[in-house]
Amino acid sequence: MPDMRLPIQYAFSYPERVKSSFERLDFARITDLTFEQPDTKRFRNLALAYEALYRAGNMPCIVNAANEVVVDAFLKDKISFLGMSDVIERTMGKVAYIKEPTYEDYVATDTEARRVALSLLSS
């Protein structure tokens, strides 16, 4: 049964590839697929992404910038995996929301969100 073990292995071993014992997924042999509702309580970053999409405006830009900052910090062992969501959520609350941003607003939002996320990491 497919699950997230292989994509997670790829993420942790990047840019190298670790040989795995996972059976290859053969779509020709699959008779049916089952999809479940994502658990946004368990996967907080997914809930934050949905919130950003719902709010629209520059919010997805804020989430993306904060996420890039925390992923980099995580890869450098400067933040825990579970701590990443806190920084993203706090960045969402601190950077000014713009309902109908211009291109210049997006550029400024990205810069500000990165600055805020970095300052939250160092506090």
Residue positions per predicted region:
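Catalytic, metal-anchored helix/loop core of enzyme active sites in primary metabolism
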Residues: 1-123
